[in-house]
Amino acid sequence: NLFINRHYFSQIYINNLSDASFSTTFAYTNNMKIRKATYEDIPRILHIFAEARTTMRESGNLHQWPDTYPSEEIVRKDISNGHCMVCCDEEGKIQGTFACIPGPDPTYAKIYEGSWPDEEPYYVIHRIAASRDAGRKSSIASCCFEWTFRRTDTIRIDTHRDNVIMHHLLSKHGFHRCGVILLANGDPRDAYHKRKI
């Protein structure tokens, strides 16, 4: 059973993971198995994104992700670059996904209505989403943040001002709102930062 002594295996595997390459070796976090996505995972990832768009709209966040975002092309690029991760349950079913990308992010170079607390190296989390049958969505976020903090001391992330769910999750996990950044298309996003204690 792969989930026996998962925390023991997690420490062994994570100690051997390369920050640059994100080895495909599994890492266990909060009963979830996190691994690099493959092209075979794309249909499930796109399904989770579709569910996330529905959840956003039901909660009043109507504009963050249009129907075409995140596109299959974006997912393929994330996978090709080794940035797309999936969170799997004990049966191996993908219940969440996120992109973990080493900084610097060009859209974070300028921040308005505030400032970044430091200029230390960081990783950026983009396109985080959980399936509707994943149970508590915060568990996917917890897995994502814990996994990323094993690779960096600082995480930056942004979200739409209307994404009440994500604002709540970020606050719950100790992220601090630093200001507003502009995406490449000029759309504003609330920018968050957390440094590992």
Residue ranges and their predicted role:
Residues 135-150, 168, 172:
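Conserved acetyl-CoA-binding loop-helix of GNAT-fold acetyltransferases
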Residues 53-73:
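Conserved GNAT-fold acetyl-CoA-binding loop/helix
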Residues 33-47:
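A short beta-loop-alpha structural element at the N-terminal edge
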Residues 162-179:
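Conserved active-site alpha-helix within GNAT-family acetyltransferase domains
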Residues 73-86, 103-107:
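A short helix-loop-beta-strand connector motif used in the catalytic cores of GNAT acetyltransferases and
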Residues 99-136:
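Conserved acyl-donor/pantetheine-binding loop and adjacent beta-alpha core of acyl/acetyltransferases
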